[in-house]
Amino acid sequence: MEKPEFKVIIVGGSIAGLTLAHCLAQANIDHVVLEKRSAIAPQEGAFIGIWPNGARVFEQLGIFGDMEKQTVPFHRMHLRYPDGFSFSSSLPELVSERFGYPIITLDRQRVLEVLHERYPFKSNIIVNKKVVEIQTLDHGARVVTEDGAVYTGDLIVGADGVHSSIRSEMWRLADAISPGLITEHERKSLTVEYACVFGISSPIPGLESGELINSYSDGSCVITFHGEDGRVFWFMIEKLQRKYVYPDNPRFSVDDAAGFCARLSSVPIWRDICVAHLWRNRISVSMTALEEGLFQTWHFGRVVLLGDSVHKMTPNIGQGANTAVEDAATLASLINGLLKSGSASHTSDSDINNLLRVFQSLRYDRVKRTYQQSCSGARLQTRDDFLKILVGRYVFPYVGDYISHSMCKDISGGHVIDFLPLPKRSKAGWAKYSRSNRSRATQLQWGSIWLSPVILCLFCMLFLWPWSSSLPISS
């Protein structure tokens, strides 16, 4: 009897899950998407930034144009500090010129709608299917949903977000088969130190389309993105009084968001605009705890995790969704490679394990670097300690070339779908910044060497100079 086709079960109609579905459809690989909610694209008041590394994958899939035409590209950013100092930068425009893709922001709902609308096999996406159990088989695996339905396949992909049931099931299987693989440290590695209010507001005079603003304060920050027709996407984060370990997270309501914004209502954003203006013009708003964590175990058996289910970061550098898109592109490329190699007729547990080990090895270091940048970004923008206040205020505004070069190198390393052609609109920045005579370690080493004397000089200026100026000068 002919062996059934290789099948992927994607749990979660998230950006990661739907992107993977698009990739697999392009490769004619059988799959199904199971979403626990009743709708693929609910309005939750959240939004996402799409950077060139995510845009390039969407362009390979032929869907980036649908997203791009619904907003305006960013060309300028402004940064404001609590002492009133501010500066502006054309970094967003520079990134677009170098890579051929702009930085844009869209409602998360609209991104999901585009992914769903442009997906060619709607019957493969099934809503109201909450997965409650994973069962292992001799030559595959299956999931059982809350309503008793069973879906069998060769690979189960957890794209179900930070509260992933697939991660929990993967851990349960690992505990039964390989006790000790999932350590207590890993189970507690997802933590919460910040709360965040996401919002979308109607146009506010003085906030120009195509611009974004970072307003830093002690313990909090406000970041606004001004889209098409002046629509304002924004988020505010604030350091909590203590650190929480998942799943013992604080929970927040709309009333909490109202209280949060009322308490920060007078915090300035730009010129005479303050938080109160964002709240007054709000269209939608939500408040959530910001989990942070990078798990060490991305796969076990025939189960693998993507996106927020395995690496969760704050929104400060805007790479969460883009990182998930890269995950999907990489995994689809590896699956396609396995099937094209002729191994499709006998995808043993060993075949799948080898594929997933390669997947994690390809993605882990890049994701770790992005995660660390996200952690640092949140703490720099909220002026978390004296050193970050010092660097953020007196170093950051004056090292634009260093920052833009480092950012472009990070973007250029983005993973793509290797069985689809690269888009023609891609510009020279991809090749230019991916080539380097220095390794990452060397780059970071020189960055540290460069920054150390700057910080040392600032220390001397701030602390030693006042004392030395009061000392008698010897003849």
Curated annotation (Swiss-Prot):
List of glycosylated residues: 437
EC number: 1.-.-.-
Pfam families per record: FAD_binding_3
Gene3D superfamilies in the record: FAD/NAD(P)-binding domain (3.50.50.60)
Residue stretches spanning the membrane: 446-466
Catalytic activities: [(1'E)-3'-hydroxy-3',7'-dimethylocta-1',6'-dien-1'-yl]-quinolinone B + NADPH + O2 + H(+) = [(1'E)-5'-(3',3'-dimethyloxiran-2'-yl)-3'-hydroxy-3'-methylpent-1'-en-1'-yl]-quinolinone B + NADP(+) + H2O
Positions contributing to FAD binding: 35, 49, 108, 308, 321
Cellular-component GO terms for this entry: membrane
GO molecular-function term, one example from the UniProt record: FAD binding
Pathway connected to this protein: Secondary metabolite biosynthesis; Alkaloid biosynthesis; Mycotoxin biosynthesis
Keywords noted in UniProt: FAD, Flavoprotein, Glycoprotein, Membrane, Monooxygenase, Oxidoreductase, Transmembrane, Transmembrane helix
PANTHER family assigned: FAD-BINDING DOMAIN-CONTAINING PROTEIN-RELATED, FAD-DEPENDENT MONOOXYGENASE ASQG-RELATED
Role this protein plays: FAD-dependent monooxygenase; part of the gene cluster that mediates the biosynthesis of penigequinolones, potent insecticidal alkaloids that contain a highly modified 10-carbon prenyl group. The first stage is catalyzed by the nonribosomal peptide synthetase penN that condenses anthranilic acid and O-methyl-L-tyrosine to produce 4'-methoxycyclopeptin. 4'-methoxycyclopeptin is then converted to 4'-methoxydehydrocyclopeptin by the ketoglutarate-dependent dioxygenase penM through dehydrogenation to form a double bond between C-alpha and C-beta of the O-methyltyrosine side chain.
Protein name (database record): FAD-dependent monooxygenase penE
Species in which this protein is naturally found: Penicillium thymicola
Gene name of the record: penE
